[in-house]
Amino acid sequence: MSIEVRGLSKRFGAFRALDEVSLHIETGELVALLGPSGCGKTTLLRIIAGLESADAGSVLFAGEDATDVDVRQRQVGFVFQHYALFKHMTVFENVAFGLRVRHRSQRPSEARIRAKVLDLLGLVQLDWLADRYPAQLSGGQRQRIALARALAVEPRVLLLDEPFGALDAKVRKELRRWLRRLHDELHVASVFVTHDQEEALEVADRVVLMNAGRIEQVGSPREVWERPATPFVYGFLGDVNQLHGHATRGVWRLGEVALPAPDLPEADNQRAIAYVRPHDIDLARAGTAAPGIPVRLNHVYLAGPSAYLELARQDDQAIIEAQVPEPLFRSLGLKEGEALLAQPRRARVFAVQP
């Protein structure tokens, strides 16, 4: 079942949580709502679920208006960050809960409930824990049980609010791969909220970047990473250097450094910022003929196959971060305190708004 929101707006007092947000999610699609705290992503998820009401706009499921439909009638599965499992119930009873509290006319028989629960526990690979209590489970196991409980009522859509946020890094990585595989089996429209860039880029079919109650960009993980639409998206997704210069007729300049600025073909000495990833910066020793930004090597740390360099510009001491392959770093024989030239190889240039 598809999900569509049209012109959603929501305020909490003077705070604007959502500002005319519109989005369409296809059946079977796994979409990540990604952004910093306070950007509106959880509010949007809760309005889709029916846990919050919008001040304006509408929510549609499969093309039908569900804006005023009660949360109990929306057939939405919701997974919270902190599991919300019933401590006094076993794993089996937790998963069966949504089925057992249905109205008598819709409630399955106990035999069907048992079969359904055991099927779901098998799906999340935890059928051997059916008789245990939540306190006897690890964090990753609890989250999988919470997901099984959400699926028990056969939701038309699945919503997850930072489902792995309370788990350690290794468990998060394992569970998000598992969620991707599980989603491919279920083929329902699923939306999950996260502030973890790696999580969104690894798991989702599409990523929705949100900022200050608005959508900045929607696209596949590859699209938003390789072609950020706005300075916010560029700055939010991964590490980036911001180099302030000027653009004229499609060329950005800072001192002797010149880079293409195809988005600014009509610029005339306009202030502009070049966004440069650390791995897109080459290094040369000071005194070479090649153009570059004069810097001094402040600090180096090695992590796996890469060397990460902190460079201080010699004009204003602003920091530039560079990332080079560890073998290349060793072959260059660079030393902390050495004068170098930072040479941006590739950048995306945005005009500074007046």
Swiss-Prot record:
It is a peripheral membrane protein. It catalyses: sulfate(out) + ATP + H2O = sulfate(in) + ADP + phosphate + H(+); thiosulfate(out) + ATP + H2O = thiosulfate(in) + ADP + phosphate + H(+). ATP binds at residues 35-42. CDD domains: ABC_CysA_sulfate_importer. Its main location: membrane. One of its GO terms (cellular component) is ATP-binding cassette (ABC) transporter complex. GO terms for molecular function: ABC-type sulfate transporter activity; ABC-type thiosulfate transporter activity; ATP binding; ATP hydrolysis activity. This is Sulfate/thiosulfate import ATP-binding protein CysA. The gene is cysA.
